[in-house]
Amino acid sequence: MIFLTRTVRVVVLALLAIPITAVFATPHAAADARKRSQAEAGALARKMLAQLKVSRPLSIRGYSRRHFQPRWEKYKGRCNTREVVLARDGRRVRKNAACHPVKGVWYSPYDGKKLKSERLVDVDHVVPLAYAWRSGASRWSPARRRAFANDLKRPELVTVSHSANIAKGAKGPQSWRPPRRAHWCRYAVSWITVKRHYRLFVTRNEKVALLNMLRKC
């Protein structure tokens, strides 16, 4: 398994944290910090992308979501991974006794929608499970596939609108990109970070699409 260097990890985490930290800065300072962080993350993502193996996609034969995720795994107490992500990504989230969110506000970075009902959001796998299967995950152990599907350390899980998640499906960046172009940099950085960590290969068209998205950094 390839682990991110400390520098790469810090820059990626800094990019992901921009919306939170920016509220404490002036508009101009926040914009400057965002541009610097995106530029650094984009440069490192290009280096990581250059290290990924380029290959043709494997067959989808044998794929089933159950090979990755029979169900969301329990994380802490009664909370499963999905519930942890919804609590992490939402604002003013209220949960019932079973840890299920019953109220909150979620922002979908893919399309810019502000959603006030848990029924309108999904937890998306940035690198879709079926896509990962064709990128090398078909050769993994069941335990490794479950770890991938429930990974809270890498930028693999994100709360998005149900409509955006359905539109994306199991497509790669060569076939689908977030409608909100301002998210292209972060999306590409997240995709590459996940693929590098799990040593998943990329296709030629996928690599070209990612490089185009990184121009937004």
Regions picked out by a protein language model, each given a short descriptive name:
Residues 54, 58-129:
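Secreted/periplasmic proteins that engage bacterial cell-wall peptidoglycan
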Residues 15, 20, 71-72, 90, ...:
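Bulky hydrophobic/aromatic packing residues
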Residues 1-31:
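Secretory targeting and sorting signals
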Residues 28-75, 206-207:
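N-terminal module-boundary/linker segments of secreted carbohydrate-active enzymes
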Residues 26-27, 74-75, 157, 187:
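Generic detector of short, well-ordered, non-transmembrane alpha-helical segments enriched
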